[in-house]
């Protein structure tokens, strides 16, 4: 399987996975025109759409793709049913599409039904985790997002992180100010800032465990750099604190 992307809207990535027969899977089409253009250019045959959650910047290309390719099958959580999902994955552990197995990983927090698709070593994770950060959390779902990130962190270190937004530079620019002594964050930020390549993805889980504070919640050195009075002795409290200060930025 090969994976390519097309950039849509402002900073969204639509990932396209295809096999030797040029049958392809489209992940989170937030817009359709760029996707169709890419498909035609490479002579791909769209067979499947995978949706991670129901936000418009991930689904608003579905309608036109379905009109253009009426035989396409759509997979997603229940919350995406309104946009044409016929193959619901909420109660499934795996799906097999294009002779390839995908593990279904519930990752609630950004939305209640948010789901990631894991086809080792590829993780299509939507807005759950970003390079250097994580998705905004829906009201009342801090614990769910915390647990979702813990689930992702248990995957193999060689897991390739295919998230849906190009936020790496802005995430690290923020966190290098919060954790100025963290050389992993600073060095990685400087490297991507110098790079002529705009796309910083995919990342790897191994890299994220070094540069992403949301995957270092048990790191006492990071906690000690945060000079506040809140009780940060527990990793959940540290996560909530980091997410709240990031939301204010």
UniProtKB/Swiss-Prot annotation:
Q: Could you state one GO biological process linked to this protein?
A: methylglyoxal catabolic process to D-lactate via S-lactoyl-glutathione
**This protein's pathway:** Secondary metabolite metabolism; methylglyoxal degradation; (R)-lactate from methylglyoxal: step 2/2
Disulphide-bridged cysteine pairs: none
Chain sites annotated for binding Zn(2+) 1: 53, 55, 110, 127
How the cofactor is bound: the record states: Binds 2 Zn(2+) ions per subunit.
Protein name in UniProt: Hydroxyacylglutathione hydrolase
Question: What does the entry list as the binding residues for Zn(2+) 2?
Answer: 57-58, 127, 165
Q: Which organism is it from?
A: Buchnera aphidicola subsp. Baizongia pistaciae (strain Bp)
Tell me a Gene Ontology molecular-function term this record carries: hydroxyacylglutathione hydrolase activity
Q: Which cofactors, by name?
A: Zn(2+)
Q: Identify the domain of life.
A: Bacteria
Q: Which EC class is this protein assigned?
A: hydrolase
The EC designation for this entry is: 3.1.2.6
Which residues, by range, are in coiled-coil regions? none
Give me the reactions it catalyses. Answer: an S-(2-hydroxyacyl)glutathione + H2O = a 2-hydroxy carboxylate + glutathione + H(+)
Q: Does the keyword Metal-binding apply?
A: yes
Alphabetized NCBIfam families for the sequence: GSH_gloB
